Design a protein with these regions (language model features):
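Extended, helix-rich architectural segments
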Residues: 1-254, 351, 355, 359-362
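C-terminal anchoring/interaction modules
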Residues: 1-57, 108, 123, 131, ...
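Acidic/polar low-complexity segments with low predicted structural confidence
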Residues: 278, 282-286
Length: 578
């Protein structure tokens, strides 16, 4: 019997490698910019940009650019996102509530805070942050779990000219791995250790030895099936050898690698560029200004050193012992003959001019203005502003650029949550238990499986099957960790509502009327609490009136009311109160 040729073999891998090389050529300019920006961030950019003025001399690199980026990263970490899942149909309300409580647990188990931080560094440095949302079948002892990883944009490739990676027919994710470890895991790689691909790398001070490493390619591609549905398939290969291919897997050949049919990568550009999913960042904008500042710093440093060191103009006929003159420890310098101003004189170096310092400071202010990293955003204030509320207001007004960046990050976070829910739907076959924080603040253990997310039959109507419906959700993102100003503002709002009597049961109607024209975060919880207080007040008033009627009856005609009837009426009043 002749073995059938697998759908993905050496020929298909060779074709994919040719496509990858074409994608690499179209991304070469971006790769060069990424490597360059990394040097700028590490303040080692003079390694690539040698200044003729600085050959053989110290190459100063001030940290204004780094400080700006570090402050923006701090803003991002102050506003760590939290998901809130909303149902689109009333039948899915319970599932949405459970998802809202377990999604933060899934993110925590995936070490999402570290992923969020690393991605923000790359977003600010490179202009684009990329996260990968995968299913790791080896996690939890083979049970499997969702994995979220920060991706290196330098090792990702897509079709040139597309603005959305989902429109690319192929997508490649590359990684460098130890060849011996690869051979131990995949024996078919033995004897095929010669790497056939070259990848761009960041520059390192000590160099990076890659002689014992091979390039592993994760190849994602979209392919229509017989019914016209677009399936996502996946192939991992190294040095021309197929390590795994979903089309070669009978369980996935007709289904696709992931049911959602999307590339499992989420791009979050800082400043968008046309016809590219990748954007540009603050380093690209601030390079020129930082270069000018560095050059001025170098010239000023040289001037200060020259001005602080005494030098002389010495004629050949002066007869001065140069060795003794240069030795500052000697108190006496011998001279042969007579010295005159024409043969020996000090060399004066002009000091720094005030306009030079002003110009350098103006370039520093320009860099701050370009990056939106003005003094007020870091707590500094102009003269005369001393009130804490005024300083906080200035900080909030100056942080609109940070809020704009956070909104784009929250949109990307919502797309990541949709991918997580899709992976739950596909792979959470067994019921799992999650420890969550309940509404009362205590621990609760919530069971959950993918069955709650899968399509359910709609039943019959008039003898006709209505088919099935898959639950669909909307995700609203809010900040889990807030800045100090946001927390103080929220606390002040709560105190004002309390002082104005919003939570007094007798003021429920007036408080609800005021809340209708107010807008602040968490207003729905406040409305719910005010309504509960109003309902409780109504029940309490009704119970008090009924008890008053009982007292009248008891005082007027005690002999006509049996003890059993009195107890029955009192118990009914207590039930109404509860």
């Amino acid at each position: 019997m002749i073995d059938e040729k697998p759908p993905i073999g050496a020929e298909e891998v060779a074709e994919a490698t040719a496509i990858l090389q074409k994608y690499k050529a179209g991304k070469a300019a971006l790769d060069k910019r990424l490597v360059d920006n990394e040097l700028w961030f590490r303040m080692g950019h003079w390694k690539n940009y040698q200044n003729p003025m600085m050959e053989g001399k110290p190459q100063p690199a001030s940290g204004w650019l780094f400080n700006s980026i570090a402050n923006k990263h701090a803003d991002a970490m102050d506003n760590y996102p939290a998901p809130n899942v909303l149902p689109r149909a009333a039948d899915d309300a319970q599932t949405a509530q459970v998802l809202s409580s377990i999604l933060p647990v899934v993110l925590e188990q995936a070490d999402y805070e570290q992923v969020y931080s690393d991605t923000w560094w790359r977003k600010l440095k490179q202009g684009t942050g990329v996260k990968g949302v995968f299913w790791d079948p080896e996690a939890r002892g083979g049970v499997g779990e969702i994995a979220i990883r920060p991706m290196n944009l330098l090792m990702l490739y897509w079709e040139p000219g597309v603005a959305d990676i989902q429109a690319s027919p192929h997508f490649f994710s590359l990684s460098m791995e130890n060849t011996k470890q690869l051979e131990n895991r995949w024996p078919q790689l033995k004897g095929r250790s010669a790497s056939v691909l070259d990848v761009p790398r960041f520059l390192h001070d000590g160099g990076l030895d890659t002689t014992e490493k091979s390039v592993v390619v994760d190849w994602y591609y979209k392919k229509p099936d017989e019914a016209g549905r677009t399936l996502l398939h996946y192939c991992k290969f190294c040095n021309g050898v197929v390590l795994y291919a979903s089309e070669n897997d009978p369980a996935l050949a007709g289904r696709g690698f992931y049911d959602h049919g999307k590339y499992p990568f989420v791009f979050d550009p800082l400043f968008m560029e046309e016809d590219s999913p990748a954007g540009f960042g603050y380093i690209d904008v601030m390079k020129e200004c930082q270069t000018a500042i560095d050059r001025m710093n170098h010239a000023m440093d040289e001037n200060v050193l020259l001005a602080s060191k005494q030098r002389y103009v010495l004629s050949d006929t002066a007869g001065v012992n140069e060795e003794e003159l240069a030795d500052l420890s000697r108190d006496i310098v011998h001279v042969a003959g007579r010295l005159g101003d024409e043969s020996f004189r000090p060399l004066q170096t002009a000091g720094l001019q005030g306009n030079s310092l002003s110009y350098r400071n103006s370039r520093i202010e320009e860099l701050k203005e370009i990056s939106g990293n003005r003094d007020m955003t870091q707590g500094g204030t102009a003269g005369g502003v001393t009130a804490a509320s005024a300083i906080a207001a200035l900080q909030e007004a100056g942080s609109k650029l940070s809020r704009d960046m956070l909104k784009s990050a929250y949109r990307a976070f919502a797309r990541e949550c949709y991918l997580i829910i899709d992976l739950m739907r596909q792979f959470y076959d067994e019921e799992r238990v999650f420890r969550v924080i309940g509404p009362a603040g205590g621990r609760e253990f919530v069971p959950f499986s993918g069955a709650a997310l899968r399509a359910r039959p709609m039943g019959l109507m008039g003898g006709v099957e209505l088919g099935s419906r898959e639950p669909v959700f909307d995700i609203v993102v809010s900040a889990e960790k807030k800045s100090t100003f946001s927390r103080l503002s929220q606390n002040e709002t709560a105190k004002e509502c309390y002082q104005l009597g919003f939570f007094a049961p007798q003021n429920a109607d007036a408080a609800l009327a005021a809340l209708e024209i107010m807008d602040f975060e968490g207003i729905e919880k406040v409305r719910q609490r005010v309504r509960q207080n109003g309902t409780l007040a109504q029940k309490l008033t009704a119970a008090q009136m009924q008890i008053a009627r009982f007292n009248e009856k008891l005082s007027g005609a005690e002999e006509n009311l049996s003890t059993r009837a009195l107890a029955k009426n009192l118990s009914g009043a207590l039930r109404q109160l509860s």
